[in-house]
Amino acid sequence: MKTYIECIPCIINNGIAAAKRLKAKDPVIENMTREILVHLSKKDYNTSPPALVKGVYEIINQYLETQDPYGDVKNYFNSELLKLEDEFKKLIEESENTFQKALKLAIAGNIIDFGIKSEISKKMVLRHIHEVENKNLEIDDSTKLYDNLKESKTLLYLGDNCGEIVFDKIFIEEIKKEFPHLSIKFAVRGKAVINDATLDDAYYIGLNELVPVISNGDGAPGTVIEDC
């Protein structure tokens, strides 16, 4: 994966959105934006977006004087979707293909990404989830995934966003039912970045009671293997 030039405005706007969420003053936002631009001008765009922008979020945190600008958002979506966990499980139990239904919910949960959208509501998330769970997957590798899990001994499940990890938890429960032989670990970010999940988030929703949860040791908004 490489970083395309079209990614750059998005990265800058994400920093500005984070600053405005915390009601930072205009001079702070302007100075922060200048430093982000300087940082990006020195980077190799052949690297992946998570690797490229790791330093950007360090700049954002420095100017906003916080290590977790999206902390309130993360807590909100973890809490609200955890309240609906039993309803989502019922949807799965009532479906003809429980594995695929749980997978669809986990895919749909990826909409909770403040690195892509600056405004996301619970209503928007629930509407998207119900749309996706009733549609066919455009690229459907669910059978291939099922067969691979059947033949595997271990699974490293890479977590992504808060709120979304509630659906990951539900999907992992389904995987454990289908493949009790499988040894599963769930990986989260090494420190807070955007609304990505950390150890605290995984523990909050009880994922650690289901499978071992580990940190990837890095603060990029993704999994950059060479830095983990």
Map each language-model feature to its residues.
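Redox- and metal-dependent alpha/beta enzyme cores, enriched for Fe-S-associated oxidoreductases
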Residues: 167-217, 224
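Short Gly/Pro-enriched loop/turn and capping motifs at secondary-structure junctions
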Residues: 6, 219-221
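Active-site/ligand-binding-proximal alpha/beta "capping" segment
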Residues: 226-228
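Electropositive, gly/pro-rich neighborhoods at or near active sites that engage anionic ligands
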Residues: 2-152
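N-terminal active-site beta-alpha-beta segment that forms phosphate/nucleotide-binding
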Residues: 90, 94, 135-188
